Amino acid sequence: MKKMISILFCFLLLVTASGCQKETEKEETAEKTLPLSISQNDWADSKQSVELSTGITMAYVEMGDPKGEVLILQHGMTDNSRSWSLAASYFAKAGYHVYLPDLRGMGKSDEPDGYYTTVTYATDLEAFFDAMGIDKAILVGHSLGSFTVQTFCLMFPERCDRIVLVSSIPVRGLQNATLAGAYAAYVEPLEEDGHPSDAFMDAWYATDPKEEIEDFDVFLANMKSEAQILSKKAWKNIFLGMIASNIEDLYPYYDETIPVLVLHGSEDTMTLGEYQEELCELFHVDENSFIEYEGVGHNVQFEIPERCATDILAWLETGALPSTDGTLR
């Protein structure tokens, strides 16, 4: 009997200690200080990493108020968290707890074998939520990041507060012939240890900023170099995974209680304007939650980071946009 009591007592001590440890970790997270802005020169060094249950180590940047509402900024194809670096400080200074992950195969995250579909990315993202202790968040995605956010919203609706789709289209694989053409012309011919040419990278990241942006040249040079050094395996897995991605069967299961904002540039030649009406129908988006920026291309958050962030913040706060005509102020 005494032995049983002793065992029970030890068990209770372990449970209590475990609970105290978790509470301590939460308190430490809430008390830590995070940057409100990060320079382009310091961006890469500001990355942390976490091991995920999906088997990869994911790199990420963390900013803002640790006690604030969690907001995830997700980058596009062959990019990394730097993609949102020009806009991230607006969200951090507005009081959000901002996370900017590097998707698998990109940035400083692992690049395992196998094609990376949007389901793969969404599953990684859920594992990131679990690893970081995030229950629910606002998700903002650009291009491939928006495809990931769409997929995540349809697979894990209980973890989505609101979502923002920037430069997006319905995810139906070969629908985007631009990707298939670029892969055939520039990625497939590469040697196993080769990298895309400077000319291709210049075209891939062709951007005409519409705002005065500090250190934009440094930003763009880093974006190009960080994508160009990716292995052929990574480029192949990213491209072919995207071309193979098709979530058409998931769209009927969209949870209508999750508000969706759609932002698009009128000059976007990658995620074409002809698909915007259909995208809005799939996610029940009305005129108060859609804006097309006149004269802006695919990389909205590169070209007009302040306007992009300001419009997203206004929508998050009020459920509507300050203007919907797309005219740049």
Q: Predicted regions span which residues?
A:
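Alpha/beta-hydrolase fold catalytic core
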Residues: 9, 20-69, 93-96, 135, ...
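Active-site loop/oxyanion-hole signature of alpha/beta-hydrolase fold enzymes
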Residues: 53, 100-140, 144
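Conserved HGGG/HGGXW glycine-rich cap/lid loop of the alpha/beta-hydrolase fold
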Residues: 56-108
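Short glycine-enriched nucleophile-adjacent loop
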Residues: 146-157, 163
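Flexible "cap/lid" loop of the alpha/beta hydrolase fold
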Residues: 154, 163-193
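Conserved alpha/beta-hydrolase catalytic His-Asp/Glu region
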Residues: 174-181, 194-254
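Conserved loop-alpha-helix segment in the C-terminal half of the alpha/beta-hydrolase fold
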Residues: 254, 260-296
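Catalytic histidine-centered segment of alpha/beta-hydrolase-like enzymes
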Residues: 296-305, 309
